[in-house]
Amino acid sequence: MAAKEKEKEKKEGGEDLAAPESIFVNRELSWLAFNLRVLQEAADPAVPLLERLKFLMIYQSNLAEFYRVRIGIMTHRAILTPDKADPLSGMLPEATIAEVLRVTREQQALMESIWKSIREELRANGADVLDFKKISKVDELMSKKLFGDIRDLLDPRIIDINQALPFLWSGETYIIAFLGRGTEQKLCILPLNRVPAYLSFEIDGCQKIVLTAPLVRHFLPLLLKKENVLQSAIVEVTRNADVFLSDVQDHADDDLRQKVSTMLTKRKREMPVRVRIYGKLTDPARALLLKKLRVPESRVFTQNVPFDLSFRSCIGGPAGLRYEERRPARDIGLKKGEYFSYIEKHDLLMSFPFQSMMPFVDLIYEAADDPEVLSIKITLYRMSGSSKIAAALAYAADKGKDVLCLLELRARFDEQNNIDYSEMLEDAGCRVIYGLPEHKVHSKLCVITRQHGGNLSRITQVGTGNYNEVTGEQYTDLSLITAREEAGLDAEAAFAALVNGEIPPEAHCLWIAPLSFKPRLMELLDREIARGEKGRVAIKANALNNVEVMEKLIECSQAGVKVELFIRGICSLRPGVPGMTENITVSSVVGRWLEHSRIYSFGEGEDQRLFIGSGDMLNRNLERRVEAFMEAVTPDTREQLNRVLDALRNDREKSRRMLPDGSYVRDEGGEGTSSQEALYRYFSARKVSAAEPEAEPQPVSVPQKAETPAPAEKPRGFRAWLRSVIS
């Protein structure tokens, strides 16, 4: 990237943050700075064209969720606690919202420029996204034919200009048209939820992509032949998603699934927090529309970038338009039936998406088929639409294992999927429980219990990411599996508490939030503070905004401890501020895969302590969620985690460094490659062997009581269903 472009990137990333005199950065503005880094990937000429288009899609999707959740929360705060300032930046809710809206408009200008450039490059590569403002006669004739194909799927509703608008669902696209003859004025509301987002045809080797919303808008007079279409626009409403179970009246039977379903219905009907308009309306028409939507002008964004860019998936073209293929390595060196024997002697670390998640699925099947296995207990937060892990758990229950699934029904925007899976797993014979009333269970924790004669042994897995094979190929995550008995006992104690609706107790080996995570984190930071200039801290996480943790990191810096923070997203602490954070560095990697793993490292050499787990350094992870962390204690797993940290240190392609003013820049020059590419090469080629000699002796096990498994009921006809799922 040229020096001028880097300077522009620096300016765009920093000028919208809190004032330099504050050591802390407003959370919402820090998140917008992260999403800007995503948008900058869409502008990077080194990124293949269709991948740049994908980053543009991700940017818009991220922003929609941000408005639904964070601006929804801020809107409620502005109403309920308007005088309560943000403890980090001192900004009041209304001021925060105003600044977010300003920054969003600023970023929109960059988004428009990027889209224009991508569109031109697509055309040069044989994929023409039609512009109905300047369309050729042949393209218009072909488009008219496509319009005829979908015409019967369109269901316009026409109302008098003085009537209330019908309800516009969040995230759905509508065409709003103003109709009139003489003094009679009407409105047409046309939902597009029944038609595909795009269509296409080919002329002389050029693929013509027809976005359905502009297509229907262009041919609207053909649909409304009896009406006089004066003007029209494409409209999308983003509604507040800040709805909680506490907002839903209790049901007599206290059925949590029903309460969550009711909450989802309520969420769909919340007030708008943003409106997007594609197409120009006259000022009076625009004002009337916003009045009917009850949305202020400040919340409205007129854009020329299509709302839906999913047409990317239909574009062919040369291989150079996409990233080189990088498939997760399926073979990690173990065959089916070898996992238990290997893990009993060695801890196993897996790194996604460089390695496949299927070996973990194989482990569940091996447990299902092992006559010595008594039980499988697992926490489930987000699963794929057709989950291989859910099928493996169902299979295990059908084989007579006691399968306990803690399913968090409140995983935002995955609630319905989790409701469906809770019913399916119950039908399979699994015991299904839910999260705690005041704490979401966000941990990625699994424990498999076996009985050899009169002795029990356990295999425990802790992960940084969801048990989801789809996101397992899109996010960087880690999974650590061990047969250490103290880890198994801690995991069992955590599940025992959760079954009883209690917060898991402080653990001996694992860190279990909310009781163990922050205290252990603070203790180890204090340990490094005591070492002064010899102290070392390296943390890879997705976000940092907890004041107590940030103040402790400032103490580390003031004591001379070298602190490296690899924070993908929100980072509310400014590095390099003299007298405060001059020994702290902050960097962020945005690349091909979404950085999602968490590594906490304290010290170096033989004294280094290394942990992985599911939680970031946000208030919610430290205080309002159940999270699980496990220490890497074997030389092999520690070496692999240090490889990850070293790759991040050496990244000169996708890493951006945070400056004291809160802006982010890419380092110029120097040797180094993309950390993700380096780690793909390392982990995809890495294999273990069941024939490896046993690892160093494990700590002495804590005595345990024998476990009596509860028999699982099997519904009739389930075997036939299960065979169809896993075949």
Which stretches of residues belong to each language-model region?
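Hydrophobic alpha/beta core scaffold segments
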Residues: 562-566
